[in-house]
Amino acid sequence: MEDEKSFSDICGGRLALRCRYYSPYCREFGLSSARLSLCSLTAVTCAVWLAAYGLFTLCENSMVLSATIFITILGLLGYLHFVKIDQETLLIIDSLGIQMTSSYASGKESTTFIEMDKVKDIIINEAIYMQKVIYYLCILLKEPGKPHEISRVVPVFQSAKPRLDCLIEVYRSCQEVLAHQKATATSL
């Protein structure tokens, strides 16, 4: 079963939450943000190149124009490959673990997997960001020798920064899977 809903991020931008239910104990949540606009990209590139052309006409040095074009192209490629994330995905399987994937605008993907026996809980935490209180979903990891202590906090959906209403929906569904996993683990 697949479900798609529209939400907004902390800045008011549009987000699409895609929920896939493969089984009662395997769920995937994908948050997609707005793609890079060709108009805004063209406007910024033209503005930088016009400023470079203005400097070129003042100092009559063609190196200024060439360097600006080269730096703009490298900066754009770096932004698309290392910074701009189009989609973040959280896959939770009760007997296996949690996989987080970030898909960049260039097509590059970054994946992190956390085994379920290392997961203590999934919570919604709050933080102060740019003079606002924001909420974020995070995974609490167990301390290896001390199962009642937390070793690390792993934030989820760092790039998308969804609002609380979106996080609550993902949180409730994750808690259903975790509750089944804990019930299965205690019955063994």
UniProtKB/Swiss-Prot annotation:
UniProt family annotation: Belongs to the PIGH family.
Pathway: Glycolipid biosynthesis; glycosylphosphatidylinositol-anchor biosynthesis
UniProt cross-references to InterPro entries, sorted A to Z: GPI-GlcNAc_Trfase_PIG-H_dom, PIG-H
Protein's recorded name: Phosphatidylinositol N-acetylglucosaminyltransferase subunit H
Keyword annotations: Cytoplasm
Any Pfam family the entry gives: PIG-H
Record's GO cellular component terms: glycosylphosphatidylinositol-N-acetylglucosaminyltransferase (GPI-GnT) complex
Major place of residence: cytoplasm
Task of the protein: Part of the glycosylphosphatidylinositol-N-acetylglucosaminyltransferase (GPI-GnT) complex that catalyzes the transfer of N-acetylglucosamine from UDP-N-acetylglucosamine to phosphatidylinositol and participates in the first step of GPI biosynthesis.
